[in-house]
Every structure is written in structure tokens, then in C-alpha cells.
């Protein structure tokens, strides 16, 4: 009898479950995966090289475009590295705002993940539910920075501006009657902080809805339990971080182990899995959303009681106030010089890592004393996770490869850079 050879199948880069431009070359024995070879580079934009020809502040918007689902956390890692080289202190209020927006971004990311992951596996409803909540958080992004996605809100030394006193409201239009308009603007009558508070008061019920649809769903469990199992030892060896590592039972979270900003003052728990499969990673991320609610509530409470500056008083780094620029020529010149020439960063190197929704996002920054980085190295969590795909998918069906890509929460902006 003739020997049957394995055959190869190209999965992506146009496949809707490939999460962007992933090309997987699968070696199959029937429908069982023998080898999965990810081909990357289709979204390579030379971010690290571009940063070498831009001033330190001009590279902040590039960070938003790495993992374009977790925008502000990318910025956070970058500005932390600059602040370490400059040796400047960030005002306490700015630190609380950063932590608040890190957690808003974590929820944004996990909502996108749960919607896309469920949709890939075949559950449509969760996707629509998740985007209902994402819309409110996108509005918060827009209220503080003017942009729904690429915010450029974190700056070396603090944040772009304090939280506004008014939340933008929906305007009357042909598709909305007055009753619908009043309902949509109900939570928008106060400040941005009031709106965020209202959102996180409502949000636990929304998470309960997602869990009602998925957690004990028989089909969901059949598709996730026992798929893509990673032992704690292998998770460490492969460099997995974030929910991928915690899903395997290792309680490693930079917010607890190497706290930055004001995370050491926050009261929250680190959810940890037991079996290291796709289902455990799902449970870890859902619980992370609940912990983000706790952290956000603590930040809101502190921010209400403690007004103050949100930018460092080091004028070599901080731009002048808008009011000053309108009345004072020196302030206008200062602003122009700062945003065209930038500021010089002392010679040295620094590594700053933040607990990104996907794992450890690190920025290694080398300065030669100029106004531009000498070298910028980005440590993207998704890169190590994608490298583990071959091992996780081996012995599973083609349909399970989709589940494994979903559980890794891959976004190609940060992998290809």
C-alpha cells in the first residue's frame, strides 16, 4: 500500500480568524496538525528604526500603533523608559490617571479579545455585547485626548492634560429621536470622571452577561477545555507572560512583583489558572476584567479628592500652558522649540516594562545624549506567544488552531513592529 504523505495548508494571511496578517503554514496528517510554521513580517513598519530619526516625544504616537487594541499601555512603557533616563518624578495625580487609563485599556483589550475569540469559535452574540461596552470606553479616550484610538495621551513627565470637567454629549440627528437622545446622554451630564465611575458601576453586570453566554456553555467548553495545554515549566521556558503565563498557574504580574506608578497602593488579586489550557486562560482574562474594575474604582475615589498638577514642573521636558502661550511670547517660543527640537536625554540606557493586557511589554532605550533615541528595542509579548503556537497546536485539529490563535490574543502591530 502506498505511503500517504503529510500535506501543507496555508492558513491566512486573508483568513478572518488569523487576527490580522498571520500566515500559518500547517503540515497536516489528515486534519491533525503535525507542525505549524508562522510566517511574520507582513505588517512590518520599521517602528524601531523610525524612532531613531524622531525626537523622543515624536515617537509617542508610534507606540499607539504597535498593539492597536491596547494603545495607552504601549505609550506607558515608552514614557517610563524616558523618565528613568531623565530621572524626573511624575506628579501623583498623573500617576493615578495613568493607572486608571491602563485599566481602562486592559478592559478595552479584553473586550476585543472575548468578542473576537468567541466569534472565531462560533459564538456571535458575545462579539456584539462586547462592542457595546467598548464604545463607551472609546468615548472616554476621545474625551481626554481627542482621538478614539491613537491617543498620544501619556507624555514624558505626566499626561497631556487633566481629566475634562464635561463629557461630550450625543447631538440630535435624523436617526435619533429626543427620547433616545436623552437616554444616551443620561450618564454624560457630569464630568469624564463621573462617566468612568458610572461605566465601572454598570460593568460587573456586563461581565456577568458574557459569563452567562460562555463560561458554562457546553459547546464553548468542548472547544476550549484541554486545547493548547502549556505546563508551567514550558510556559517559563518559552517566555510567555501575562494571561498566557498565569493561565498555566504561575502568579507573575508586574503590577504586583515590580510595581510601577501607584500600583503598590492598589488592592487587587492576580487570577491564576490550574490546567494551562485555553479555558483556563479565558477564565483568567475574565477575572482580570473584574480586578480592573476594583483598581479603577480606587483610582476614581483618589482622583476625586486630590486635585493637582498632571505634568512635571521640569520645563526642559514639560510644555508651557496653553493660557501662557496665548499671552507670552517666550512661552510660544519655548513650545515651538520643545516640539521641533525636543529635549536632550542624558547618555545611558534603561529598560521599562509594564503589565500590558497581553503580557510584559518592555521598552529598552539607549540614549547617546542627543534629542533622539540612539536605539529603541520593543519587547512585544505577542512575539513570544506566537513562537509557542507550533508546540501548542501540535496534535490538534485545524479548527483548534483557530482557538489557539484566539487564546494567545495576537495583534500583529506589535509582533511585526
Curated annotation (Swiss-Prot):
Keyword NAD part of the UniProt annotation: yes
EC number(s) per entry: 7.1.1.-
GO molecular function, one term: quinone binding
Catalytic activity: a quinone + NADH + 5 H(+)(in) = a quinol + NAD(+) + 4 H(+)(out)
Keyword terms of this UniProt record: Cell inner membrane, Cell membrane, Membrane, NAD, Quinone, Translocase, Transport, Ubiquinone
Enzyme class at the top of the EC tree: translocase
Topology of the protein relative to the lipid bilayer: Peripheral membrane protein
Function of the molecule: NDH-1 shuttles electrons from NADH, via FMN and iron-sulfur (Fe-S) centers, to quinones in the respiratory chain. The immediate electron acceptor for the enzyme in this species is believed to be ubiquinone. Couples the redox reaction to proton translocation (for every two electrons transferred, four hydrogen ions are translocated across the cytoplasmic membrane), and thus conserves the redox energy in a proton gradient.
Official protein name in the record: NADH-quinone oxidoreductase subunit D
